[in-house]
Amino acid sequence: ALTVFLWTFAEREKIYDLFEQICGARFTTSYTRVGGVANDIDDHVLRQIRDYISKFPAELAKSEALIARNRIFIDRMAGVGYITQEQAIQLGLTGPCIRGSGIAHDLRKAQPYLFYDQIDFDIMTQNDGDCWARFKVRLEEMKECVRIIHQILDKLPEGPVMANDPHYVLPRKGEIYTRMEELINDFMLINFGTMPEPGETYTAIES
């Protein structure tokens, strides 16, 4: 009963190792910043990511083969937690939860952000609306994510990883000690934070 749990946790640890190499933290990554990301990714880490996703499908298939025929697991998932399409919409479900009820809604397609409009991928759905359907959606999405990651790595642009806007972005530490303007900008951002124009904005991302 613990075999799949241990196998999948081994994969989770490999992903956490990649997180750690990218930003220095395994779980509380804090990689994104206002205006960009904390630091660039070096070629060594990119090669490690490619190496990992080349091996991941085989590891996933191994776990799927073991659990997809497990009668106890299926009995505890199939026909349990049934959600109709109408209920899914009324409850405001997103991600695999709404797609497990047969609704092909994905913000990466419906309202593309970043450069998802340049990525070729399919929306995974199941029509049964139960826990088993949602599990199968998540399983298929992991397979589809391998395709997505390959494309993102191929399209990853070179250049700065942080915007150059003193109203929102902290100056580089080396400049604070040599330029008065940068020292003032650092002081204002640390003490008062960003001060956007009046108004509201909301941006949703896929769950």
What spans do the regions from the language model cover?
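Metal/cofactor-centered catalytic core regions of large enzymes
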Residues: A1-S207
